[in-house]
Design a protein with these regions (language model features):
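A short, internal acetyl-CoA/4′-phosphopantetheine-binding micro-motif in the GNAT/acyltransferase core
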Residues: 78, 88-97, 126
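Conserved beta-strand in the GNAT
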Residues: 56-60, 67-76, 86
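Conserved acetyl-CoA-binding loop-helix of GNAT-fold acetyltransferases
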Residues: 91, 97-114, 137
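Short amphipathic alpha-helix that is part of the acyltransferase structural core
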Residues: 1-48, 60, 170-197
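Conserved GNAT acetyl-CoA-binding A-motif
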Residues: 84, 112-129, 150
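Active-site/acyl-donor-binding loops of N-acyltransferases
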Residues: 140-162
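Glycine-rich acetyl-CoA-binding "A-motif" of GNAT/NAT acetyltransferases
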Residues: 66-70, 134, 147
Length: 197
């Protein structure tokens, strides 16, 4: 038996549950891409949820032994695109094709409806030259259609650390003309000219 549990306190009483929830995403990433996966850690996901630019709701699928075998979330922008919701439904690779994804999708879609999110966005991924193992077929059966293909590329840095250090501290490298600026919870008005958000 699988139980779907709402995660309401990822920093306190449900901290371990949230960590196990995040691990489902990492297990999926490792399954697909090995050590080159881009899944975020539980700490990174907690931090992302602290901003005021989005509201996230998360659920875990827990099996009869108390293990988290699936994870879902609905991410809703709060400042623009207010009809949009990003959904993520992931089942641990060892527990797929048993209905867990469908169980997780139900509360995710219900929450989207309750928050008037009429445009749901999701993504799936696979290695170049391969095929999607489960996401596209699952989504199609649930009424979703593919709309955009995005290529993910990775560039391995040279292993020569001394060469990297020299390049980053080289005199006359042109870095003096650049400034790194960071903002939280949206882009300041004065930065918006010429940018799309």
């Amino acid at each position: 038996m699988v139980t779907i549990t709402l995660i309401e306190d990822p920093d306190g009483g449900q901290r371990r549950l949230f960590d196990d929830w995040a691990e489902v995403f990492a297990a999926d990433g490792r399954h697909l891409f090995g050590p080159d996966h881009t899944s975020r850690s539980a700490a990174e996901l907690r931090e992302m949820n602290r901003g005021s630019d989005r509201h996230s709701i998360s659920w875990s699928a827990i099996d009869g032994d108390g293990r988290v075998i699936g994870a879902a979330c609905l991410v809703m922008p709060q400042h623009d695109n207010l009809a949009q919701g990003g959904i993520n439904v992931v089942v641990h690779p060892d527990h797929r094709r048993r209905g867990v994804g469908s169980l997780l999708l139900e509360p995710t879609e219900a929450a989207a409806r309750a928050h008037d999110r009429t445009l749901l966005l999701a993504e799936t991924q696979w290695l170049a030259g391969g095929r999607d193992e489960s996401g596209e077929e699952f989504a199609a059966r649930k009424g979703y259609a593919g709309a955009q293909t995005i290529l993910r590329s990775s560039l391995s840095l040279p292993a020569d650390r001394a060469r990297l250090a020299a390049a980053s501290t080289a005199a006359g490298d042109g870095a003096d003309g650049y400034v790194l600026r960071t903002c939280w919870d949206g882009i300041p008005e004065e930065w918006l000219a010429g940018r799309a958000e």
